[in-house]
Amino acid sequence: GVAEAEAADYVRSDYLIIFARSAGSFGRGELLNTNKRMSTISAAAFADTKPHYDILDGLRGIAALTVVWFHIFEAFATSHLDQRINHGYLAVDFFFILSGFVIGYAYDDRWKKMTVAEFLKRRLIRLHPMVVIGALIGAVMFYFQGCSVWDVTKVTVPMLLAATLMNACLIPASPGTEIRGLSEMYPLNGPSWSLFFEYAGNILYAFFIRKLSTRALSVVVFLAGCGLAAFAVWGPLGDICVGFAMTEENMVGGSLRLMFAFSAGLLLSRVFKPVHIRGAFWICSLCVVALLSVPRIGGSENLWMNGLYDTFCAVVAFPLLVFLGASGKATDKVTARVCKFLGDISYPLYMVHYPFIYLYYAWVKNGDLTFRESLPCALALFFGSVIP
């Protein structure tokens, strides 16, 4: 089919309705008015359209669903070594590759008719509403999330208001100054850190990367891939679960994750030549879930082994899955509907589920609950996040 907006954004205005309504943040009338305004902006901004990669929408949703379970299992992990859905953090690298691919596909041939300011405005309109909604939900729920891991009783209302404003404006907090005490860039809604890097990638694309020749872009991808591999294999962590804090290793690792994945997606969009593949969505979905669910490899004594696995996923497997997903088509009604549903929920699900994860985490820690004891609430959290 043909998308009503450009194929790159995957963030429709009805996201505001789906998740703001489920979170109870707005009244129905205000939500409908917001949706109409966003639709008007979208229609005016994109008179021309391109074919839409429905399967990539669906794969983004599959990865987002897996991330929710990855975060649910954080409540029972003692470290990265024993967490279930152990490699769920790699979904961010998959998102970055998808983002680079669809942005290159949608915008590379439009720069003669579009300014940098217009591009950045479009991206801001598409991405930022959910950043604000996530910050507001996080602020409203903050005082219900106190536990032994973080003490919320010492946080004053002015401190909370300041944190809300910073989160909503995507201004990162430095370690020691954020209100939860976990050194997160965005303590009210942790996953916002990836939007910080997403914005950085969009800015780099608008001012610099789009101007590179395909050969020069290939060099950038190669060098960034080497840097990412070195960080993963020989770095101090044995993984690339970084980018969420304003520390040296997080900034270096997060930047490498962005530079490789986003640039690789852009490069793939330039050289992409589809092949015929049947059942691409279902095959790729199983691969995404399987790759993200692999247990930690190598243990604490062989960190490099897990780093090697992370490198394989980020550098080899994910670009291949994006290629296969872009090559396939949702030819039957069931697949098409599933992909549309998953595409519709993917971004808002990712951006607003985590404040509820904080609440679940605190409940588990305060009650010293096992996963089996908390399973009904875990399921309620999952389906409550997914179902409009």
Report each predicted region and the residues it spans.
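Loop-to-transmembrane-helix entry motif
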Residues: 123, 127-131, 345-352
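Membrane-interface helix-loop-helix regions
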Residues: 127-199, 227-248, 312-326
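Central hydrophobic cores of alpha-helical transmembrane segments
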Residues: 218-228, 280-289
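Helical transmembrane-bundle signal
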Residues: 67, 96, 102, 135-138
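Alpha-helical transmembrane segments in multi-pass integral membrane proteins
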Residues: 39-55, 62-88, 104-117, 173-182, ...
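Short, intrinsically disordered terminal tails adjacent to the first/last structured region
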Residues: 1-47
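Membrane-helix interface linkers and caps
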Residues: 103-123, 146-156
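Alpha-helical transmembrane segments and their helix-entry boundary regions
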Residues: 56, 118-119, 127, 194, ...
